[in-house]
A protein has these predicted regions:
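Conserved, well-structured ligand/cofactor-binding cores
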Residues: 2-486
Length: 486
């Protein structure tokens, strides 16, 4: 029934597309492949087997697998395992794959075989056929360049796919995420310095608390971003160790003893950052622990961004019914029915990205558990979610800094609320005790008066002493405010 279904589906696709097809052979026999396709029978089978979604491996992943095939071909030529003419054609074809010239030829769905074998073969076939074309041969003939015997020498999908994930993640983190986070860190630090003179009411449990400088709040945001950068850099060190060289189950069967170390050296040269062979192939191929760790660091960043963005939204709420302590850049109209309404759309966008990344991490965690014995069987979905998280965090952090944080301005609402607030009574505690201070705060709240006026009536402290004790500036630093206690 399954075979009949596939044949029928293949026929329907032909009729619908009105394409011309070529006959191509693989280890299972003949199969029809579009005449202009660079992929082959193995890929075509996978394309028909997995009509699940429109999700494909990302540009960063295809770039990485192309680099691996190129480095492998160079290494195999050096080791005398690959003819120079064939090898040079494979190198050229692999470079073209990395450059994005054949992205449309990577047609296998993300929801495929759990090892990613279909995508490894997709790469092997595209590179093989392009190399055949370069050498003047017939695409689909598998001569003089064979996808397995030449492009895949010394490799297995079981070590190529996890290595591709690591390299794609590292490359994207280096080129996109870290620069984006550093830009956001600079923006928060700049606002921290700008806003340090401005004192506002603290809000623990969303209730009035002792004063804090607006700059101190932004310094906290900067600290969260800085620590996320540090965590991600630790994860980068783990990702730099790759599975290549373990082949099928980690033993390295059918690979040259010097293959992996030489390929890693070549990859380091191509990429501009260090790639090293794992010290333990059995853990590297049987688990996705390093990928799970990296995703966890991205999730932590997402949690930080959600909290920071919500704080910015709250502080900018209003303009008349909210806190209104800051104003955000007005980037677009906010309502189709309420004129002049402007919403905090950039922080809202970041919150949605954070939610997506947190969900992606849950998927990666489940994928990481799904290894039986010597291989993980959810590598494609782990790759998709990890790389998507890196991509959307990179763009959203850059967007947050440029379109929001850099343009934030402070209002006078914060200092005004401090003067009216009750929490400044806290600095009376060292002088008159907790219970008496609480009584003064309750009386101020009930009477609608401020702490200063009530304290003048209810304590023996002079106005001069109270001005010094209740000075909000002194409350934003360690120590007791005001006059000597006793």
């Amino acid at each position: 029934m399954g075979l009949m279904y596939k044949k029928q589906l293949n026929l329907e696709m032909k009729l619908a597309n009105k394409q011309e097809y070529r006959k191509e052979k693989d280890s299972m026999g003949e199969f029809d492949v579009p005449v202009d396709a660079y992929y082959g029978a193995n890929t075509m089978r996978a394309k028909l087997n997995f009509p699940i979604s429109n999700l494909r491996f990302s540009r960063s992943f295809i770039k990485s697998i192309g680099y691996i095939k190129m480095a492998a071909a160079k290494t195999n030529m050096e080791l005398g395992l690959l003819d120079k003419d064939l090898g040079n054609a494979i190198v050229t074809a692999s470079q073209e794959v990395s450059d994005g010239k054949f992205d449309e030829q990577f047609v296998v769905d993300i929801f495929q075989t759990g090892s990613g074998t279909s995508t490894n073969m997709n790469a092997n076939e595209v590179i093989s056929n392009r190399a055949i074309e370069i050498l003047g041969g017939v695409i689909g003939s598998r001569v003089p360049v064979h996808p397995n015997d030449h492009v895949n020498i010394g490799q297995s999908s079981n070590d190529v796919i996890p290595t591709s994930i690591h390299i794609a993640a590292l490359d994207s983190i280096n080129s996109q995420l870290i620069p984006s986070l550093e830009k956001l860190l600079i923006a928060f630090n700049a606002k921290s310095e700008e806003f340090m003179p401005i004192i506002k009411t603290g809000r623990t449990h969303l209730q009035d608390a002792t004063p804090i400088r607006l700059g101190q709040e932004f310094l906290g945001y900067a600290g969260q971003i800085e620590r996320s950068i540090n965590r991600i850099k630790v994860a980068q060190n783990e990702l730099a160790e790759v599975a290549l060289g373990g082949t099928a189950v980690g033993t390295g069967v059918n690979t040259h003893p010097e293959f992996a170390i030489n390929v890693c050296h070549e990859l380091s040269s191509i990429l501009g950052f260090d790639i090293k062979e794992t010290s333990n192939h059995f853990q590297a191929q049987s688990s996705l622990d390093n990928i799970v760790q990296a995703s966890g660091c991205l999730k932590t960043l997402a949690v930080s961004l959600m909290k920071i963005s919500n704080n910015i939204r709250w502080m900018g709420s209003g303009p008349r019914g909210g806190f209104g302590e800051i104003t955000l850049p007005e980037v677009q109209p906010g309502s189709s029915i309420m004129p002049a309404k402007v919403n905090p759309v950039i922080p809202e966008s970041v919150c949605q990205v954070a939610a997506q990344v947190i969900g992606n991490d849950a998927t990666v965690n489940i994928a990481g558990q799904s290894g039986n014995f010597e291989i993980n069987v959810m590598m494609p979905v782990a790759a998709y979610n990890l790389l998507e998280s890196i991509d959307i965090l990179s763009t959203s952090c850059s967007n947050l800094s440029i379109q929001c944080v850099e343009g934030i301005e402070a209002t006078d609402a914060g200092p005004t609320m401090v003067r009216k607030g009750l929490a400044i009574v806290t600095t009376l505690v060292p002088h008159i005790g907790y219970d008496e201070s609480a009584r003064i705060a309750h009386k101020a709240q009930e009477s609608g008066r401020n702490i200063m006026d009530v304290a003048l009536e209810e304590t023996d402290l002079s106005e001069t002493e109270l001005i010094e004790i209740l000075n909000p500036e002194s409350m934003t630093e360690p120590g007791s405010s005001g006059v000597a206690i006793g």
